[in-house]
Amino acid sequence: MNIILMGLPGAGKGTQASEIVKKFPIPHISTGDMFRKAIKDETDLGKEAKSYMDRGELVPDEVTVGIVKERISEDDAKKGFLLDGFPRTIDQAESLSQIMSELDREIDAVINIEVPEEELMNRLTGRRICEKCGTTYHLVFNPPKVDGICDIDGGKLYQREDDNPETVSNRLSVNVKQSKPILEYYNNKGVLKNIDGSKDIDEVTNDVIDILDHL
């Protein structure tokens, strides 16, 4: 079972990824984890990726694609994988198709967790952090007992700069633009499965598992 997990920031991908790998014996492979592992293992591609990252440059597609191929060829991914954070471009999606073809495998489903942008804004801008102890709150899902004050030590709560509405809105716009052609690509291949991510977490999980059970 070879799965790609997609969704905008705040859609709950991390939560659903955890539930999927609990239910199915496949590794959760995120782009960040892949890079860290390749660099730690000092593979040729890992060293090459590190040289770009150390210079503050974007890692070229051919290096990223090579690292993906190495990772999904490992023993723990032979029965399947859950890929998160890749592909990000049509070129990467086509490269992944080529890799899967070389490995005589295919992508079984692309799970896209859909949440209205307004709801994502609420989720992403509601985070507050205690300036003393670092405890995280959420104005909607996990509010402090007293507005603006930490329950634990009475510290003042603040909003991180990248959680402010303007930054979040820009981030969502970039992600929508980036993901649209990839979703169309997989829809044309007949493997795209859209999930309503605005439901309760357990309901979303049940919907995801139901799709995967029927592959």
Swiss-Prot record:
> Any keyword Zinc?
yes
The residues that the entry says bind ATP are G10, A11, G12, K13, G14, T15, R127, T136, Y137, K199
Name the positions where Zn(2+) binds: C130, C133, C150, D153
- Pfam families hit by this protein: ADK (PF00406), ADK_lid (PF05191)
Q: Which Gene3D superfamilies match?
A: P-loop containing nucleotide triphosphate hydrolases
Q: Where is this region: LID?
A: 126-163
According to its UniProt record, where is this protein mainly located? cytoplasm
Q: Which CDD domains match?
A: ADK
Q: Which NCBIfam families match?
A: adk, PRK00279.1-2, PRK00279.1-3, PRK14527.1
Domain remarks in the Swiss-Prot or TrEMBL record: Consists of three domains, a large central CORE domain and two small peripheral domains, NMPbind and LID, which undergo movements during catalysis. The LID domain closes over the site of phosphoryl transfer upon ATP binding. Assembling and dissambling the active center during each catalytic cycle provides an effective means to prevent ATP hydrolysis. Some bacteria have evolved a zinc-coordinating structure that stabilizes the LID domain.
| Subunit note | Monomer.
- From the Swiss-Prot or TrEMBL record, give the protein name: Adenylate kinase
